[in-house]
Design a protein with these regions (language model features):
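Short beta-strand-to-loop acidic/aromatic patch adjacent to the donor-nucleotide binding site
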Residues: 88-99
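Conserved donor-nucleotide/metal-binding helix-loop-beta segment in metal-dependent transferases, i.e.
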Residues: 103-132
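C-terminal catalytic/acceptor-binding lobe
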Residues: 171-269
Length: 269
């Protein structure tokens, strides 16, 4: 695998409320994905914060500075990917509380990049099978593991780790935001917009699913790595095996507290 690809990156979106978990997240990205030399970008609105400065100085994170108008949950996704350097073609967006605590499958990451290189019809490849593709979804290429997401799947779009063609990720959030503004015109404050983005969850429910299935036409494909089995830890047998959702309803989960202490990056949240 060409682990030094300059056209791939990891993109983290975060806001000051959640900065305290970022050092643990990025430190473990560097520790457990040490052979993966993709650039890491943090899209956020307070670049002068001491934690942001530490991420830059200690871990080589590059900042994408957002305005206050771009700091909403959905708005920040669009602005973050839109402000990446022009040489970035593929992006792996991850939530700020997704913690990688084991080595990724470098061969599968390389294969995902290669698929995007050679097949313009592929817009994304889901790396974490949570949810996994339906068992009867068609195989993308005979002899390969990737499945094509279809109407059998409840979720085509998910915030779980997915490698995206940058222009398709941008197009999705651009259209999603236009639809949200049209269908939720009364959501004007930061809290109201956050309610639509998270509580209504317009991206991961039928609204976003239907949009993604039609965006780009019938030729556009979204692939997913299959789940190894029905047991709960099967999700970690995947190309990017992170611990999802370290913060739930504004509370730091116990596993994240323990992980931070064990790894030497305690989280005060």
């Amino acid at each position: 695998m060409d682990k030094h690809r300059k056209d791939c990156c990891i993109l983290i979106n975060s806001t000051p409320k959640y900065y305290s978990i970022l050092v643990l997240q990025v430190a473990l990205l560097r520790r457990y994905a040490a052979k993966l030399k993709w650039r890491i970008f943090l899209a956020t609105e307070q670049p002068e914060h001491e934690i942001c400065k530490r991420l830059v100085q200690e871990f080589g994170v590059e900042l994408v500075v957002l305005t206050d108008q771009e700091s909403g949950f959905l708005e920040s996704r669009l602005a973050g990917v839109g402000k990446l350097p022009p040489e970035i073609f593929y992006v792996l967006p991850i939530q700020d509380d997704f913690i990688l605590d084991r080595e990724p499958m470098y061969d599968m990451l390389a294969e995902a990049c290669n698929i995007l290189d050679i097949d313009r019809n592929v817009a994304s490849l889901r790396l974490m099978p949570c949810p996994g593709p339906a068992v009867n979804d068609p195989v993308y290429i005979p002899g390969k593991v990737w499945r094509i997401l279809t109407d059998n799947d409840d979720m085509v779009f998910t915030y779980q780790a997915t490698l995206w063609r940058r222009i398709d990720y941008y197009a999705f959030f651009k259209e999603l935001l236009l639809g949200v503004k049209r269908d939720y015109p009364d959501a004007v404050t930061v809290e109201q917009k956050r309610h639509v983005a998270l509580n209504v969850n317009c991206a991961e429910i039928s609204y976003g699913q239907n949009l993604l299935k039609t965006l780009g036409g019938e030729m556009i494909l979204h692939l997913a790595y299959p789940r190894a089995g029905p047991w709960s830890n099967a999700v970690y047998l995947c190309p990017f095996p992170y611990r999802p959702t370290a913060i739930v309803r504004g509370k730091l989960e116990d596993f994240a507290k323990e992980l931070g202490k064990r790894e030497g990056f305690p989280v005060v949240f």
